[in-house]
Amino acid sequence: MGKIIGIDLGTTNSCVAIMEGNQVKVIENSEGARTTPSIIAYMDDNEVLVGAPAKRQSVTNPKNTLFAVKRLIGRRFEEKEVQKDIGLMPYSIIKADNGDAWVEAHGEKLAPPQVSAEVLRKMKKTAEDYLGEPVTEAVITVPAYFNDSQRQATKDAGRIAGLEVKRIINEPTAAALAFGLDKAEKGDRKIAVYDLGGGTFDVSIIEIADVDGEKQFEVLSTNGDTFLGGEDFDQRIIDYIIGEFKKEQGVDLSKDVLALQRLKEAAEKAKIELSSGQQTEINLPYITADASGPKHLNLKITRAKLEALVEDLVERTIEPCRIAIKDAGVKVSDIDDVILVGGQTRMPKVMEKVKEFFGKDPRRDVNPDEAVAVGAAIQGQVLSGDRKDVLLLDVTPLSLGIETLGGVMTKMINKNTTIPTKHSQVYSTADDNQGAVTIKVFQGEREMAAGNKLLGEFNLEGIPPAPRGVPQIEVTFDIDANGILHVGAKDKATGKENKITIKANSGLSEAEIEKMVKDAEANAAEDHKLRELAESRNQGDALVHSTKKALTEYGDKLEAGEKEKIEAALKELEDVLKNASSDKAAIDAKIETVATASQKLGEKMYADMQAQQAGAAGAAGAAAAEGAAQGGAQTADDVVDADFKEVKKD
């Protein structure tokens, strides 16, 4: 059985890790980095770039370079968060036929799971290159506050990437696993994981206990905001720069997608620099032009200014902390350790706020970029049966229920319930002789169903005619270890049953997923063909170069006919290499022709080299013989007799 890899599929960056024995290994990608930007670029020639190569070309290809797609995964187009992003993103966010938020690149409509699958495929390939064997199974992390649709969409992304997702695990829980197994402290500890990533914020209160030699990680509560993260911090800087430039130059950069992409890059860089320095300078020459000529942007930003710009964003993270503490039934003073996860937690203002709320310094010995992937790899080892000393008890982040008479949300499973869990309740009909009931399933904390997220609905038909309130319909909610909901309804009188895994009227259908899996496989085959073609072209170029060089040096030793034959074969190979539509077979055939025609040339080169070596060896032998004769004469004359006396210690 192959290894189960751990993948942190992040909004801004992603990371992959595996366990080797009891040691964790965060794997470097093909560019040599331990994290990969979650950026995907669709090129004109149908090539798809992922990670650093995609990021590098984003300024010149803003409409087809997709980033922060995780913010759209499992979301409806109408959601206010999606509407907010439409005005900010250089790429197009569109409404799919089923009402979901999709994106567009080169006129092609793409589902967020399909785009995220490209990042997962890169993570899979990174692990395969390191292990030297195929990888088919993974544990993928999601923000703890992700709802059912978002979890299901993440699982779909894994399938499209060719991975069997063994478990969806919450990011703060994964970070706690990485932290807890790394520490030797005995006894029970309560920790708070504050996870502020590129697009999402989570906080979880987790108890780590030693139970009969096994470390038990029990999530007591979780809270968060799935639309708050580093991207929002970047946006505040971008808005500030646009405002200042407009005041100074009278030009609005927000309408220029190329300028916006440069601003995004500069804002991210400035934010990072201000985590260590007090001031930074944003310098972007030729940012735009008007009738008076080119315009340059030069702006100084201080750390104090940045903190003023994002103060309310940092403040927004504190209320979820307060709720999580309350829901866990603990006091702030009960928290032993505070762990920071996510790149945005490197900002001094964030650390200061966290310290102020929890009353203690956050731990500095956890890598905020890698802890989540490490935790996922540990969970992968547990699921493969190779590790028995860890037990993980996670929770469902939001309450689940159904709509009952009057549009009320009747909760079946409350938030922060340990999963997996199952709950059944009996309901009845609202009208006389009602032959069918529609079960609408919602997720959220509001009293009225309409204020919560509709996960899906289904019908139970064939209920025998009876007065209202008489039929007994048992509704069962079952949440699996991935936090994904399965619902069933059963008429107790007839035994009629209807079960669904919540697939809202949103989300990808089975047929769509299958098509995307097939497309991905076809792309992989196409990529392989392109790589083989590139290798043949390289081989052809190298052969042309080496043969021409050999002809220059040894051509005069060939008969005229032989030389002409080689030159003709070379010309044919050069022509086929110049033709962009040449396939691998055509190039390989011409390579073979040149190789065959050059045999005589090779023989001449070989004979010449052997003659040179023989000449050199003869000269070296003569020199060695002369040296030996001189050495022999020296030996007799140059012997020095020496007296010596042995000194004995008493």
UniProtKB/Swiss-Prot annotation:
Give a GO molecular function annotation for the protein. ATP binding
Keywords in alphabetical order: ATP-binding, Chaperone, Nucleotide-binding, Phosphoprotein, Stress response
Q: What is this protein called?
A: Chaperone protein DnaK
- Lineage, please? Bacteria, Pseudomonadati, Pseudomonadota, Betaproteobacteria, Burkholderiales
Read off the CDD domains from this record. Answer: ASKHA_NBD_HSP70_DnaK-like (cd10234)
Q: Which family does it belong to?
A: Belongs to the heat shock protein 70 family.
Biased region (Low complexity) positions are 613-634
In terms of InterPro entries, this protein maps to: ATPase_NBD, Chaperone_DnaK, Heat_shock_70_CS, HSP70_C_sf, HSP70_peptide-bd_sf, Hsp_70_fam
Residue segments, region Disordered: 613-637
Q: Which organism is it from?
A: Burkholderia thailandensis (strain ATCC 700388 / DSM 13276 / CCUG 48851 / CIP 106301 / E264)
Question: What is one Pfam family matched by this protein?
Answer: HSP70
User: What are the Phosphothreonine sites (modified residues) in this protein?
Assistant: 200
In terms of NCBIfam families, this protein maps to: PRK00290.1 (NF001413), PRK05183.1 (NF003520), prok_dnaK (TIGR02350)
